[in-house]
Structure formats: structure tokens, C-alpha cells
């Protein structure tokens, strides 16, 4: 063995590298068409539920929560609890009215989930926008300041209302790609949401 590569072997290797590179480079117009189809698919996604965990860091505090989110059109229910079920709360919302109930039977009401959580926790969290981000699309009614797509036309990163949203993973749910992890960042506030147990009832 001389350790030298034959011209034929080199040519074959170069051809394989070129072809594999071409397979990864999707034309921009094709990715945009894939993204439009992706958005149309999400427009039909009105009824769903998902479980997961959320890790929040804000103003020197760190909180880890279990969550279950059920969405039925414009009506939603979010159940949150700390480790071992501690501090369980339930948020029930519809346009113009949101109610938070804790395990002791106490309740509070506001016009939006952002207003409610700010009053109860002191944190500004984009719950209304998260309803859209959690299924992988830009939030309705907010300007998109930045958007990048992955090679199959799904959002890779977007920015809205000062929040940077990074989609870190996807899972197939009955033929629809839905996020398995979403990271949110705004200033010193960071929130990581790991999602599992997706269920659709929009068929």
C-alpha cells in the first residue's frame, strides 16, 4: 500500500461531496413556498393540548414549572405547578377575560394574561404571543422584526415585540411538525419551554 489516492477514487469522492452539498442547499424561493405551506397548515390548528416544562430566569430568580396547555379555538386553560405539584395554579382565558385560580381556592381576574401575571408575579411574560409561538408560527397581530428559516421552511428564529424566539427542536404529530423546544429571550429574561405529549383534535 502506497497510501496514494487513485484519480478515480478522488473524482468519486468529490462528486459525492458536491451532490451532498447540493442536497442541503434549498433554493430561497422553494423555502419560502415551504414556509407558506407551513403557515397554512398552522392556520387550521385551532384545538390542541400539550404538556411540558418551563424554566424561567428573570431578575436574578430561577423558576422551574410543569405545564399543561389546552387550546380550544380562542378559549384556553393553562395548568402550572412547581416541583412535586407545589404551588399549582390554573389560568382560564378567553378574549377580554382571564382568571387565575390557585390551590387554596383564591382567584384573580384581568383582561389579559400579561396583565394578570404581572400583577400576581411581577414578571412580564408574553402568554398571548406564546400561544402562537408554541405551535411554531409568528404571533398574530405583532410585527415580525426578524425571521430565519431552516432548510425545510420551518422557522428557525424570529423576533417580535422585543422577544427573540429560537425553535430548538421539532416533533411530528399526526403529520404536522410541532415544536419540541422553544427558547425565549428578552433582555435579562430567559424562558426555555420543553414540550411533549402533543395532542391534536382539529381534524
UniProtKB/Swiss-Prot annotation:
Gene3D superfamilies: Lipoprotein localisation LolA/LolB/LppX. One of its GO terms (biological process) is lipoprotein localization to outer membrane. It is found in: Cell outer membrane. Its main location: membrane. It holds the Pfam family LolB. It is a lipid-anchor. A lipid is attached at residue 22 (N-palmitoyl cysteine). One of its GO terms (cellular component) is cell outer membrane. PROSITE patterns: PROKAR_LIPOPROTEIN. SUPFAM superfamilies: Prokaryotic lipoproteins and lipoprotein localization factors. Keywords: Cell outer membrane, Chaperone, Lipoprotein, Membrane, Palmitate, Protein transport, Signal, Transport. Residues 1-21 form the signal peptide. A lipid is attached at residue 22 (S-diacylglycerol cysteine). Belongs to the LolB family. Plays a critical role in the incorporation of lipoproteins in the outer membrane after they are released by the LolA protein. Monomer. This is Outer-membrane lipoprotein LolB. The gene is lolB.
